[in-house]
């Protein structure tokens, strides 16, 4: 387990799930989120790694699980968590998925599990964000209804922002997706807006008490892939507003593989620390 603790504010934990991914987020209000939940090198990851952590921090509910994409090493424990939620007092309130034009048998099975557990599903695309107290979670990828080359290309890219802390999580996004992110971010870097004039994000989701969850407002996209707008920027600090990819901590793409986390992305992100979630003999 790798723990990033901001005293009294925000805890981010990268769980040791071997060749897989699971990042836990706990706000100062003790609201808990997960980004992915899976492994291909460890069996029963939910039972032996994720659920014990949830019990350790004493959570009463998981406000949401962000599934960057549905490869096994990112979702293998989701079914376990849903079953545990049905039989325990810890409820999973929502699951977030990338809003892409790609469906396959694995996704259909996952959606069926979610439906049977009576958990709501929200689809995210670039430009949308949610607020939970002081924590802002921005979606930077994919653009709405993207037709991805494969599951990796469908990956959610999330940016956590609270005060002067930012964390970028890129799922298994590879070079073509990173190139798109960099292209969208460059206008904000090359022509930064003055403080106080940052462009507002088009929609927001505020976390409400149990039973009062607000539906995610969406802005339909009518642009083609080649005509997508630059990523809007409205984080909490001026430096972040000038560069939507700038981060304190970067969760390396595709478990640190050579076809991800390229120099162009690193040049814009300029992380102080890079984390890699992987197992033995990772390539």
Pin down the residues of each PLM region.
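Non-globular, low-confidence helical/coil segments that flank catalytic cores
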Residues: 1-283
């Amino acid at each position: 387990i790798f723990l990033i603790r901001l005293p009294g504010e925000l805890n981010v934990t990268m769980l040791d799930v071997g060749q897989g991914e699971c990042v836990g987020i706990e706000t100062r209000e003790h609201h808990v989120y997960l980004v992915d939940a899976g492994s291909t090198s460890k069996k029963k990851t939910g039972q032996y790694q994720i659920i014990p952590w949830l019990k350790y921090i004493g959570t009463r509910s998981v406000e949401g699980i962000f599934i960057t994409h549905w490869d096994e090493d990112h979702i293998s424990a989701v079914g376990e968590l849903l079953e545990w939620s049905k039989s325990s007092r810890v409820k999973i309130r929502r699951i977030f998925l990338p809003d892409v034009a790609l469906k396959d048998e694995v996704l259909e099975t996952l959606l069926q599990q979610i439906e049977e557990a009576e958990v709501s599903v929200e689809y995210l695309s670039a430009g949308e964000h949610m607020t939970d107290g002081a924590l802002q979670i921005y979606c930077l990828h994919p653009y709405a209804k993207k037709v991805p080359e494969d599951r990796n290309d469908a990956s959610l890219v999330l940016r956590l922002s609270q005060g002067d802390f930012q964390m970028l999580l890129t799922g298994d996004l590879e070079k073509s997706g990173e190139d798109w992110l960099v292209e969208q971010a460059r206008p904000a870097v090359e022509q930064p807006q003055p403080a106080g004039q940052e462009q507002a994000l088009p929609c927001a989701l505020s976390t409400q008490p149990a039973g009062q969850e607000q539906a995610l407002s969406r802005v339909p996209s009518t642009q083609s892939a080649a005509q997508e707008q630059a990523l809007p920027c409205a984080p909490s600090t001026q430096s972040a507003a000038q560069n939507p990819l700038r981060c304190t901590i970067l969760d390396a793409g595709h478990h640190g593989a050579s076809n991800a986390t390229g120099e162009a992305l690193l040049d814009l992100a300029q992380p102080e620390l890079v984390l890699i979630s992987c197992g033995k003999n990772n390539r």
